[in-house]
Structure formats: structure tokens, C-alpha cells
């Protein structure tokens, strides 16, 4: 938390209240969805003691991050790439998933994520991920398969964060099909260099 406070002192905070409120609204929806998600799959919510906070930093850099405990920063530079609420929710879901995964690894071992992956398969036919996302008219499993992602738990932590982030975003009512477009925009904005990891 000390590092986060130092970042807030050092960096210039954006005065774009509208975007900051949008970030906070997305965050609140995701907080609720994460709690509901873990409750439904029968695993203790690793975010119970998080003190969620959202800041918008005035910086051209295309970046976002989340510190342990739910301290989330979005840089104004990434807004050129997110383009819309669904794109912003994709970035935030990814960052929040990192915080959830890191906390899970510290508290209960990496097995929690693998267990969640197994539970996802278990509930795919009628559980929490089969709820209909009101913005798309599709369930999360359908959206994930449409994007071409079904089992990320054999890949890197980045892939796991992408996957869990999309689950959290979809359960919060956002269209995760935007994620694929977002990554293409990131690639284009980076002019063929390696896509930055936020």
C-alpha cells in the first residue's frame, strides 16, 4: 500500500472525472461479479479483504496495472486503444485477474486457479458461466469459445489473467468479444513491436 500511495503522490492524476467514474463503475460491477463467481463455485473469495481503489493517471503510456489488494491504475494513454467501455472492461478484467491470481497463489497456492479451471468445465453446462450476458445475449462459455479460448490453464500466467479477466468482465455484463479487437488495436498502436503486457 505504501508503494501505491507513493505512485499517487508522484504521478499526475487525470482530471477526467467522467472516465474515472466509468472506471469506478466497471470496477464495482467486477467486484460484485468476482464475489458471486467464487461463491457459486464454492471457493472462498480471495478478494474479501481487498480495499479496492481506482485511479486514472495522466500519462501517454499505454498501460494499466493492479497492485495486491485491489489498487488499480489506468493510464490515459491506453484509452486511445480501449476505445469503448467493453475495451476498458477487458483491460480492467485482465488487471483484476492478476490481483486475484497473485493473492490466490500467496494464500492458497496455484492449485486454486487450476481448481477454478476444473470447476469451469464442471459448470459449463449449466452453472455460473452459463448465465446469459445481457449485453450480448450469449453466455460466457459461448463467448469464450467464440473467441477461441476454452482451456488456458496449460498456458502462461498472462493467458490465465486474460481468461479469468474475460470471465469477470462477461459476468459483469461486458462484451468480451471486444478483447480480441483490443489486442489487435494494441498491436497496431505498437507498430509491429512486441505487444506490451499491461
Spell out what each predicted region is.
Residues 1-198:
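A Zn2+-metalloprotease active-site environment signal
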Amino acid at each position: 500500500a505504501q508503494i501505491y500511495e507513493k505512485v499517487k503522490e508522484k504521478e499526475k492524476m487525470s482530471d477526467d472525472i467522467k472516465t474515472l467514474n466509468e472506471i469506478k463503475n466497471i470496477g464495482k460491477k467486477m467486484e460484485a461479479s468476482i464475489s458471486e463467481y467464487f461463491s457459486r463455485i464454492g471457493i472462498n473469495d480471495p478478494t474479501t479483504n481487498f480495499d479496492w481503489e481506482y485511479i486514472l493517471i495522466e500519462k501517454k503510456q499505454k498501460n494499466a496495472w493492479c497492485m495486491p489488494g485491489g489498487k488499480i491504475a489506468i493510464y490515459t494513454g491506453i484509452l486511445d486503444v480501449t476505445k469503448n467501455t467493453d475495451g476498458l472492461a477487458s483491460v480492467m478484467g485482465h488487471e483484476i485477474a492478476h490481483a486475484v491470481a497473485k493473492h490466490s497463489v500467496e494464500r492458497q497456492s496455484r492449485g486454486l486457479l487450476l481448481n477454478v479451471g476444473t470447476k469451469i468445465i464442471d459448470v459449463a453446462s449449466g452453472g455460473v458461466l452459463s448465465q446469459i450476458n445481457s449485453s450480448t445475449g450469449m453466455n460466457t462459455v459461448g463467448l469464450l469459445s467464440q473467441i477461441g479460448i476454452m482451456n488456458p490453464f496449460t498456458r502462461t500466467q498472462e493467458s490465465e489473467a486474460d481468461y479469468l479477466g474475460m470471465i469477470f468482465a462477461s459476468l459483469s455484463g461486458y462484451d468480451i468479444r471486444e478483447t480480441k479487437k483490443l489486442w489487435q488495436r494494441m498491436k497496431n498502436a505498437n507498430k509491429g513491436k512486441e505487444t506490451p503486457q499491461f
